[in-house]
Each structure stands twice: as C-alpha cells, then as structure tokens.
Curated annotation (Swiss-Prot):
GO terms for molecular function: UDP-glucosyltransferase activity; UDP-xylosyltransferase activity. Belongs to the UDP-glycosyltransferase family. CDD domains: GT1_Gtf-like. It catalyses: cyanidin 3-O-beta-D-galactoside + UDP-alpha-D-xylose = cyanidin 3-O-[beta-D-xylosyl-(1->2)-beta-D-galactoside] + UDP + H(+). This is Cyanidin 3-O-galactoside 2''-O-xylosyltransferase FGGT1. Expressed in ovaries. The lineage of its organism: Eukaryota, Viridiplantae, Streptophyta, Embryophyta, Tracheophyta. Xylosyltransferase involved in anthocyanin biosynthesis by catalyzing the xylosylation of cyanidin 3-O-galactoside to form cyanidin 3-O-[2-O-(-xylosyl)-galactoside]. Required for the accumulation of anthocyanin in red-fleshed kiwifruit varieties. The keyword Glycosyltransferase applies. It comes from Actinidia chinensis var. chinensis. Its EC number is 2.4.2.50. Pathway: Pigment biosynthesis; anthocyanin biosynthesis. The gene is F3GGT1. The keyword Glycosyltransferase applies.
C-alpha cells in the first residue's frame, strides 16, 4: 500500500518573497502525490502560474484582497505598496479570515501552511485541521528575536536587551549593532495589521500552530532549530534547500547579449528584491561604490525614496561615466538565470532568504548589504558563522554605508590573492556542492513528508 496523501492548503503572506517559496514547496509535495489548494491574490496568480509544475495537483484559489482605506486601489502584494503601508496590506489579509474558513470548509483540507496570519491556528482548530507555520524567516532570526526566552521577560525589550543573545541561544557570533537593535526594538512593537503588534502576531502564530516549518537544513541551522523546538515545545519540519526547478524560458536577449560582452566572472550583479527602497543618499553611495570597483555591473533597483524613477535619481553625468560597462535597471529580471550566467562573478544582495538561496546554488562571490529585519541576521550568519560572504561595513550608530565601503567589500570578496576572497570562495564552493546534492534534497523532502504524516496521524 502506498504512502497516504493529503489535501494541503497554502496561504502565505501577500509578498512575492513568501508566495514563491510556498509554491516551490508545493511543487515538491505534489511530487509525493499530495493535492494542493494554493490561495493567492487574484491578479498575482498569473505571475506564479509559470512556476506551477503540477497543475493537475496544484490548484490556485483566487483571493480578492479587500480594500483598506489608505491602500492604493488594486494593491495586492508588498511590491504594490511602500514599506510604511504594509501594515494596511496585513489588515486587508486579516479581513479574508471568513472567506478562507469557508474555502477550507468546502475543500475539506487536512492541513494548512501559513505565515503571519496569527488567526489561522484558531480557524484550523475550529475545522479540525492541522496548521503549520511555514516560516520564510530563518530559524536563527526567529530564535534571536521572537523566542519565548525573549517574549517572557515581562517588559518591552530595549536596544540593550537585543544586543545580547537570548538565554540558551546557540550562537554567540551573531550580534546586533546599535542601529540594528534600535530598528528591531521599534519593529517588535509597531502595529502590523489593525491593532496587532508585529511581535505579538508572530509569537501567537508560533505558539498556537501545531508545527513549525522552515526552508533550511540541519547541517546549516540545526542548533537554531533545536533551540526553537525546545522553546516552543512543538515539532520543527525542515524542507531542506527546496531547490527551484530550472526555468523553462531562456534569459531575455537584452541581458544575454549584454552579459555576453564581458569575460567570465567579471560582472557585479546588484539586486535588493521587490520591496527594498533605499534613501536617496544611500542609493547614490551604492552607485558610487559600483563605479569605484572599476568592474562592469548590472544594478536592479527600485527608485529611492523621493524619486519617481531610477533615472531621475542617478547622479549627474552618471550614465555617461559608466557607458558600456554599467547599467541601472528598474523592474523585474530573471535573477536565477542572471546568477547562472558565466560573466557574473559577484552578487551584492540585500540578504533576503530567497536571494541567498539562489546565490548559494551558484558560483558568484557574495557581498552582503542587509536592509531590514531578518536580512541582518542572515548576513551575520553568512559572514561570521558560515563565512561564505563579505558584509559591507556600516556606521555603528546611523547604519549608513559609503561608496568606499561598498567598493572595499567587493574587492575583499573578488581580488586575486586576497585571503578573505579565498576563504569565502572555498566555503561557498563546499556549501554549493552540499546543497546541490540531489540525495540531500530528496532525503529532506522524504523526512518532511514523514513528519507531516506523523502530525496528521
């Protein structure tokens, strides 16, 4: 008799950086024969349809995102709104609770995978189904910022509290700087959807779900996973690296032709995801740093705060000075294919979990320039613990970087004969070989599937 199969619902936070990894996991679980109902904002569905590799088993369920005063009309995901308005988007998602419950009731699902919707475990319990908080944020970050060891101190956490690891945390090398601790302290208490604080939303999600899930490996984050399992007293399901399937379409000709004009390993690719918006001075310092390296570069960036377009934010005579060797592009690109291109030798990343995964699967050297939240601890883990990248130096108090610090990090990572470059290159090569082992992924998905069976009894 074959292994049991289940009807799984997916309802990730309305951000492409969450929707996409949930779909990658859905593809892996569909291979095991599970039926997936994937709830997704209506207009966003077409963006993900090309990545649905099992349309016979994975069905998209459209969700009309309720309008909330203050949101742009038609806004569906975080890429449609500036960062300060994400709290209103969370409010809109919270207002789908009744619709979601009705959908689950009609579909007769067995288990739901979710994140950020702290009401989901209660909905699941009412319907007699299980809930898994499948968290895109790394276990290292959750353990550092959201564990019961933090929450149960009986008062609001200060900057000083957050600059010290929580009791029992397994890694003393991860430390926050002053400006980072200040930002984390503010983020914990900010309202994120109605009157619910960000830290409370996450803590309730982890405390009341039946299991936690993460896209990681024990070989990389095992101690952090053990810490969370003991802190929350519930199972942790690890899906492994969840390597995206190779894209079916080739790299767009405009980029294939441009990258093809440079020697192997010589181009810097710089991208900060669909949400990161830099301040004007930091945007221009970043571009200055790219120019100072003397290397060809492709920078994919959003317009900085206060600018309507990337073009109007460029320094005077910038385009003339980098003509033929530098491009600043506003808009979506095929990042996975760009990172795979032989000309790309360095990736300056904001350290979002999806971008880091794609980077580790490829050969380019990593330069780490985190912006907010979990990106900071991701960068610290990559640079201090795993030593697979070089982090850009920032001011201790103000958190600002300079063009010179960007250039210095690139040179440290790229220069021939540099001990730092050799160390991160060797460590990255070992990590890449480990992650691309097909037996590794299949064993993790098998174990994930087994733990899911145990959970559903």
């Amino acid at each position: 008799m074959g292994a049991p199969t289940f009807h799984i619902a997916m309802y990730p936070w309305f951000a492409l950086g969450h929707l996409t990894p949930f779909l990658h996991l859905s593809n892996k679980l569909a291979r095991k024969g599970h039926k997936i109902s994937f709830l997704i904002p209506t207009k966003t569905q077409q963006k993900l349809e090309p990545f649905n590799l099992h349309p016979d088993l994975i069905t998209f369920i459209p969700v009309t995102v309720p309008h909330v005063d203050g949101l742009p009309l038609g806004a569906e995901t975080t890429s449609d709104v500036p960062y300060p308005l994400q709290t209103l988007l969370m409010t809109a998602m919270d207002r789908t609770e009744k619709y979601v419950e009705d959908v689950f009731l009609g579909l007769k699902v067995d288990v739901v995978f979710f994140d950020f919707t702290h009401w989901m475990p209660s909905v699941a319990k009412r319907l007699g189904i299980k809930s898994v908080n499948y968290c895109i944020i790394s276990p290292a970050t959750i353990g550092y910022t959201m564990s019961p060891a933090r929450q149960l101190q009986g008062r609001e956490l200060t900057e000083a509290d957050l600059m010290v690891t929580p009791l029992g945390y397994p890694d003393s090398s991860i430390r926050l700087r002053t400006h980072e601790a200040r930002a984390f302290a503010a983020r914990r208490v900010m309202k994120f959807g109605g009157d619910t604080r960000f830290c409370d939303r996450n803590f309730i999600s982890f405390s009341e779900c039946d299991a936690m899930g993460f896209k990681t490996c024990r070989e990389i984050e095992g101690p952090y996973c053990d810490f969370l399992e003991s802190q929350f007293e519930k199972p942790v399901l690890l899906s492994g690296p969840v390597i995206p399937e190779p894209p079916t379409s080739p790299l767009e000709e405009i980029w294939a032709k441009w990258l093809g004009g440079f020697r192997d390993g010589s181009v810097i690719y710089c991208a900060f995801g669909s949400e990161c918006t830099l301040k004007m001075n930091q945007f221009q310092e970043l571009l200055l740093g790219l120019v100072l390296t003397g290397m060809p570069f492709l920078a994919v960036l959003k317009p900085p705060i206060g600018a309507k377009s990337v073009e109007e934010a460029l320094p005077e005579k910038f385009e003339t000075s980098v003509e033929g060797r530098g491009v600043v592009h506003e808009g979506w690109v095929q990042q996975q294919l760009i990172l795979e291109h032989p000309s790309v030798g360095c990736f300056i990343t904001h350290c979002g979990s999806g971008s880091l995964s794609e980077a580790l699967f490829n050969k380019c050297q990593l330069v780490l320039l985190p912006n907010v939240g979990d990106q900071i601890i991701n960068a610290r883990m990559m640079s201090q613990n795993l030593k697979v990248g070089v982090e850009v130096e920032k001011g201790e108090e103000d958190g600002l970087f300079t063009g010179e610090s960007v250039c210095r990090a690139v040179r440290d990572a790229m220069e021939e004969g540099s001990e730092v470059a050799k160390e991160v290159r060797d460590n990255h090569a070992k990590m890449r070989e480990f992650l691309l082992n097909k037996d590794l992924e299949s064993s993790y998905i098998d174990n994930f599937n087994k733990k899911l069976q145990d959970l559903l009894g």
